[in-house]
Curated annotation (Swiss-Prot):
Lineage: Bacteria, Pseudomonadati, Pseudomonadota, Gammaproteobacteria, Pasteurellales
Gene: yacG
Transmembrane segments: none
Free-text function comment from the UniProt entry: Inhibits all the catalytic activities of DNA gyrase by preventing its interaction with DNA. Acts by binding directly to the C-terminal domain of GyrB, which probably disrupts DNA binding by the gyrase.
Entry protein name: DNA gyrase inhibitor YacG
Molecular function terms from GO: DNA topoisomerase type II (double strand cut, ATP-hydrolyzing) inhibitor activity; zinc ion binding
Cofactor: Zn(2+)
Amino acid sequence: MPDEMIEVPCPICQKSVPWINESTFRPFCSKRCQLIDLGEWAAEEKAIPSDTADFAMDPNVSDGWSIK
């Protein structure tokens, strides 16, 4: 049985990307698309959804790094 090549769409431009070791930027098609995605995460345009409250904003929660 011959190996089937798996292809995935680039998350940024939707170009088809072969899922092989030689695809350096997978799942992205290029360094450009990889950096665009990184920029979106850094600018907080993307986020992982969560049902929990943001504990970092709770003044009653200590991280142990407060200066006294």
